[in-house]
Amino acid sequence: MKEFVDFIGRALGAFFLFVALMVVSCDKVPSEGDEVADPDPITGYVNLSASSTANSYIINQGGSYRISAVRGNDASDVLQTARTAEVLWESFGSSLSLSAGALIKSVLYKDGYICFKTNDHFKKGNAVVAAKDESGKILWSWHIWMTDQPQEHVYKNDAGTLMDRNLGATSAAPDEYSVGLMYQWGRKDPFMGPSSFDQNREFAKSSITWPTPVASDPSTGTVEYAIANPTTFITYNANNKGWYYTPSAQMTDTSWGWTDSKKEKSIYDPCPAGWRVPDGGREGVWEKAGFNDIASEYVDEKGVYANMSSSLKIWFPNSGYLSGAGSL
């Protein structure tokens, strides 16, 4: 089985930590923008979830799209009480301001699908759409990643195949659009990354004012709260070393699937279909690929330039990190 890996790069002080996302199958996402044969009566909307469902979907051209209103990669876990849909936020991932509708001009819920249309002039960026019940409660939300199709980079020693960019990045070149999005460990929904590589960083602009972070307590430090409040950062809990208030198997074993002995993709995994969060440690991609034995490296404000060998050089963006309080 071929392994595919996506990654989020994060800088920790002067040292760089890269959290990888790995796939469990070699099945690829159908080319976004191509019509997928589907017997469903909803016409005019390309079904991005026809082959497989996920918490993130890539599109690389304008049009009308739909995704199944299910929980992550579990196509059988249908949101039975969903009644409406909403765009929660949009962003170019930079310092450029934008208003609602800049990327996605309309969204609706219909017959078990979230249906949306992009702006007439397709632009690269990120958005999150949500399904709500009759009372307006968010039942689930999905990341819409608007970018050119990421390329695959195969790493040695059967370590895996990395994407050429961070999750949410709209560029693989050494520029501000390569930074990507930020995630709290185990949560499927993204937060804004920095707007640039400047040392005095600010969050990338988006179409909303983000809620004030909340402290983790018995009511907020739960998976249920995180799902219903995808734009709210839950601050660090000193007792449990994270946002989750009460440790349990639901958090440690299935949040992103890292310690799942079956190597199955968790429904909370933030990766697109065909990709997943990988294992760490000695059997992880970084150890196998030899990242701990890099010959030499050069660091500047944009990132790390590393010599894996005399003939192979790689670059990772200086994406920064979110503190336990939710600040850059």
Q: What are the residue ranges of the model-derived segments?
A:
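Short hydrophobic motif
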Residues: 1-2, 162
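Bacterial Sec-dependent N-terminal signal peptides
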Residues: 2-3, 19-44
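Extracellular ectodomain segments of secreted/surface proteins
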Residues: 34-90, 101-106
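Short, solvent-exposed loop/turn segments at the edges of extracellular beta-sandwich modules
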Residues: 134-135
